[in-house]
């Protein structure tokens, strides 16, 4: 029986993390299953959600129950969503790195190391992501939503990196 990388990654993500995460002492309700289930059903058919539409799904539901004007709780919801995508992205990175180590071990002498190139690319991406999201935060300077914009940016960029890493795995890296 064969499974796609997306299926394996989704199953891994669904089993590694708890279904409902109490994020902090403040009482918020963050259910990561909303994002994970959306993602596992994404891009299957034209009627299914797109991968990008799954970004923030759990945070939105969390904020809807926290109260729109409660900035501190909303930030906790957004932070929990970022943490979820960061964990999924890290898992995909390490899976890809392991696959590339195998490829490197079978490569001809003089061929650039795919693992080293992946590491260099990932460091550059982290720098770009952090700079881009700091820029987004500074656009709002001292407003109550400044930190929320930064976290939302980090989440979006990290989720997109997860998609990239997963696509590389699916291409047979």
Which residue ranges define each predicted feature?
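N-terminal signal peptide c-region/cleavage motif recognized by signal peptidases
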Residues: 18-22
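Bacterial N-terminal signal peptides that target proteins for export
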Residues: 1-11
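N-terminal alpha-helical modules
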Residues: 24-173
